[in-house]
Amino acid sequence: MFVNSSPIADGLSALVGLDSQPLQFYERGDVVPPKDQGCWQIYRGILQVSQWTLGGDEVLMGWAQPGSFVGLDFSAHQRETYQIRALTDVYLRGYSLEMITNNANLCRLVLDQTLQQVRQREALLAIAGYKRVDERLQGLLNLLGQELGQPGTGGMRLSVRLTHQMLANAIGTTRVTVTRLLGEFQTQGKVSLDGDRHLVIALGN
């Protein structure tokens, strides 16, 4: 299970008394191993969760931000097909299933956030159903702006830098196609790049 939290405090202030759990650090690009018999909560940074199909294709499952939980619903056989990757440097705190079930605040927090996870999954499924690649890419960028964007000049600035290959994998196309479409989107004013090469998604697309 991975679910997003709004402000960071939503997911962290409710855990007073559990913040003595040690933090684990992973660098940007690292693959994070699933937490055995439990889950990770993000203290700082952003993770992406994907699943590999039997045919070797990567299916994007969503993103998780500070306060979010990752991995609670990975069954034993699913752990081999799921991949958790750090999109930024991340600090994670691990919780066992026993700790979750025995702490009312922690359990309630996980349950409350589940609806956000469901909405994100539904949005990704809807995007995957678009027939045209440009519509899938535009839909993905809009969702990224909602989930990972920060308001700024010209629109929503993505807080992480995503490669064209990562975007291509997410919508089932090629890197070359994504590069071409992003160029067209820039010409049309739908997206831009800031000084740090972060994508800025124009509002109203």
Curated annotation (Swiss-Prot):
One of its GO terms (cellular component) is cytosol. Residues 164-183 bind DNA. GO terms for molecular function: DNA binding; DNA-binding transcription factor activity. Its main location: cytoplasm. Residues 131-204 form the HTH crp-type domain. It is found in: Cytoplasm. SUPFAM superfamilies: cAMP-binding domain-like, Winged helix' DNA-binding domain. Keywords: Cytoplasm, DNA-binding, Sulfate transport, Transcription, Transcription regulation, Transport. Probably regulates the expression of genes from the sulfate permease complex. This is Regulatory protein CysR homolog.
